[in-house]
């Protein structure tokens, strides 16, 4: 055996098989017909093409490849005319014209221009439905495919058209089981595009949505005909599919009625907040929080499960989420919920309590943050209009929370009282029985007279609650009361709707909502809790922040700013409020002086320093007068 590597026979044959052609030959059919005769010997043909092209280049003829391609196209097998072939997939969802594509149990293929069989996809695949989103008007395509003889059901994902139109993006379908890679991606794109074009009128069109709740045509997802879910998030798809009637309606109704007639107002408020969710947009309100908190082991999570079971699967981790996600994930969840309650459990898992306000403001805005799109412009902003029902072992509104956060939240502290007599049994029962009340409640809203009665009763509750209670709190509470009243009329018929007297203890007044009022109360308590910091006695080894004389705390401005910033209060905002409300004494140099300060000069620790002169409460200060209310009489109600 020689040491030289054997040269393939086809390579040895290529050189002698290519004649010497002239420039005139290249302008005729002669060389192209000669080469085309070797079309079935692909490797040899490529060798011959390379040598022929070299000859043409030597003769300064630059059109060789264009002439070759034209000759091949003119002499390749004629494509089947449009509509000659039809899809012949076993048990196919529908039959479509396939043009020159051969569509059978072995997949999709076509005849190439050299007469060869080209595989587009190794298994059956076809477009079956055009999907148009009711909100964005974006079109998607539902494709159907199945692989292997053991797969009886067709997989039918809904895919964005920009994915199906791109050979780079369509490869992502491999994650869903489609046999696509970089080799056949381009052919698969062409096939799906051609199939839609050939069968545009035959492929049915379906309306779709990517969220729960009210749709532009007045229907309510998922309780609507002719609308499918087209979202890309598989987790949201599972939640959407969980919005169905499961188990026994009478069993669920028994738990709900027992809760409504029970002693736990917090549990009843959670249920009312669930029914209130689709009413927020109807009554032209913004989203608001109902936060249930107290010691562990009293059934607060089961209260959330009861609220969730009105609509769908109440298991924690499915419809009910936790506060552990990012702000973006919470935005996505809120926009998916749309007009059903946004339910979040376990606030305490968040490490940074100062971000509580951010969550409240973000979710109560009802619109996602504006963000740039990858291809330029802005992303489509998402919207929601609902109630946000949350739970924790602590309040969500802190002493230093902004007034906007406080008024957007109804905080329900159940103390140590259990919400249910047997929380474990209630939880297990709800997991097996859910989804009945939501559909019936929405059906009741289709009656124009019911809608008008709803608006009337909400206005009456608003009027009865108005007074010292902050306006946003009044609006939220009136919606909760109206929702519970409507649920009683449409579902329960037990006369156990919440009353003004029952909800009022959880509402806050205008003064309680004012962050500066809360800052003043906190400061007074902080000063009282740190007496040594205001004692200039030489025996005091620690820091001296000021002195207290005649009911006035002279607080060194440096230390004052430090403690205020530590609690996330604004010193300048507070001092402006305190000056306007007579809570401080300050130096005054005249109306037109630019030297007016919010401080006074006071000797502390042997040196005169700028101090905030804060007037402390005295024994004569009166407690806030309770808000007086006129009870709403059932006889006056439209339900």
Show the residue positions of the predicted features:
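Conserved glycine-centered beta->alpha loop in an early N-terminal alpha/beta scaffold
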Residues: 3-16, 27, 33-265, 332-333, ...
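A short beta-strand-to-loop transition that corresponds to the Sensor-1 phosphate-sensing loop
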Residues: 346, 385-395, 413-415
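Phosphate-sensing "switch" segment of ASCE/P-loop ATPases
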Residues: 382-384, 400-494
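DNA transaction DNA-binding modules
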Residues: 41-46, 50, 70-87, 203-204, ...
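AAA+/P-loop NTPase substrate/partner-engagement loops
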Residues: 302-355
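AAA+/SF3 P-loop NTPase mechanochemical coupling elements
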Residues: 373-390, 405
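P-loop NTPase catalytic core of nucleic-acid-dependent motor ATPases
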Residues: 227-316
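Conserved catalytic/switch belt of AAA+ P-loop NTPases
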Residues: 357-372
């Amino acid at each position: 055996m020689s040491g030289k590597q054997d040269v393939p026979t086809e390579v040895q044959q290529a050189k002698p098989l290519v004649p010497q052609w002239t420039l005139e030959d290249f302008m005729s059919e002669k060389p192209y017909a000669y080469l085309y005769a070797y079309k079935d010997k692909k490797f040899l043909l490529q060798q011959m093409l390379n040598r022929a092209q070299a000859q043409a280049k030597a003769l300064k003829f630059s059109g060789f490849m264009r002439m070759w391609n034209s000759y091949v196209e003119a002499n390749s097998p004629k494509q089947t005319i449009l509509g000659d072939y039809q899809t012949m997939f076993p048990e196919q969802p529908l039959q479509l014209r396939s043009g020159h594509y051969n569509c059978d149990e072995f997949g999709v293929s076509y005849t190439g221009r050299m007469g060869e069989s080209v595989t587009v996809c190794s298994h059956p695949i076809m477009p079956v439905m055009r999907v148009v989103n009711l909100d964005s008007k974006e079109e998607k395509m539902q494709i159907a495919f199945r692989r292997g003889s053991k797969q009886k059901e067709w997989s039918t994902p809904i895919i964005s058209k920009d994915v199906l139109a791109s050979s780079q993006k369509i490869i992502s379908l491999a994650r869903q089981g489609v046999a696509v890679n970089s080799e056949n991606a381009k052919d698969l794109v062409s096939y799906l595009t051609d199939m839609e074009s050939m069968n545009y009128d035959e492929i049915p069109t379906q309306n779709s949505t990517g969220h729960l709740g009210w749709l532009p045509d007045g229907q309510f997802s998922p309780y609507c005909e002719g609308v499918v879910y087209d979202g890309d998030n598989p987790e949201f798809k599972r939640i959407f599919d969980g919005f169905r009637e499961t188990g026994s309606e009478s069993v669920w109704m028994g738990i709900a009625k027992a809760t409504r007639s029970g002693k736990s107002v917090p549990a009843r408020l959670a249920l009312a907040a669930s029914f209130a969710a689709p009413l927020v947009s109807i009554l032209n309100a913004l989203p608001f929080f109902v936060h249930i908190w107290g010691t562990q082991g009293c059934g607060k999570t089961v209260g959330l499960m009861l609220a969730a079971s009105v609509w769908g699967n109440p298991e924690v981790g499915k419809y009910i989420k936790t506060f552990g996600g990012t702000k973006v994930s919470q935005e996505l969840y809120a926009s998916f919920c749309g007009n059903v309650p946004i339910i979040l459990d376990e606030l305490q898992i968040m490490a940074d309590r100062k971000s509580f306000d951010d969550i409240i403001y973000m979710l109560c805005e009802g619109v996602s943050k504006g963000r740039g799109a990858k291809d330029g412009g802005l992303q489509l902003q998402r919207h929601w209009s609902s109630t946000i029902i949350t739970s924790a072992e602590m309040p969500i509104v802190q002493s230093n929370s902004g007034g906007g956060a406080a008024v957007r939240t109804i905080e329900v502290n159940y103390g140590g009282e259990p919400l249910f007599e047997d929380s474990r049994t209630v939880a297990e029962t709800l997991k097996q029985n859910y989804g009945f009340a939501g559909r019936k409640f929405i059906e009741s809203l289709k009656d124009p007279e019911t809608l008008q009665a709803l608006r009337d009763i909400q206005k009456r509750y608003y009027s009865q609650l108005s007074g010292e209670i902050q306006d946003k709190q009044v609006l939220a509470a009136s919606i909760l009361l109206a929702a519970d009243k409507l649920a009683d009329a449409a579902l329960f018929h037990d006369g156990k709707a919440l009353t003004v007297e029952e909800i009022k203890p959880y509402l806050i007044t205008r003064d309680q909502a004012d962050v500066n009022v809360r800052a003043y109360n906190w400061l007074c308590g902080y000063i009282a809790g740190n007496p040594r910091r205001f004692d200039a006695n030489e025996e005091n080894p620690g820091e001296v922040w000021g002195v207290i004389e005649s009911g006035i705390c002279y607080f060194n401005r440096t230390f004052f700013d430090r403690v205020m910033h530590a609690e996330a209060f604004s010193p300048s905002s507070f001092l402006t409020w305190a000056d306007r409300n007579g809570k401080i004494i300050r130096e005054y140099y005249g109306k037109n002086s630019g030297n007016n300060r919010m401080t006074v000069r006071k000797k502390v620790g042997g040196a005169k320093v700028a101090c905030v002169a804060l007037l402390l409460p005295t024994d004569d200060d009166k407690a806030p007068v309770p808000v007086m209310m006129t009870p709403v009489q059932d006889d006056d109600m439209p339900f």
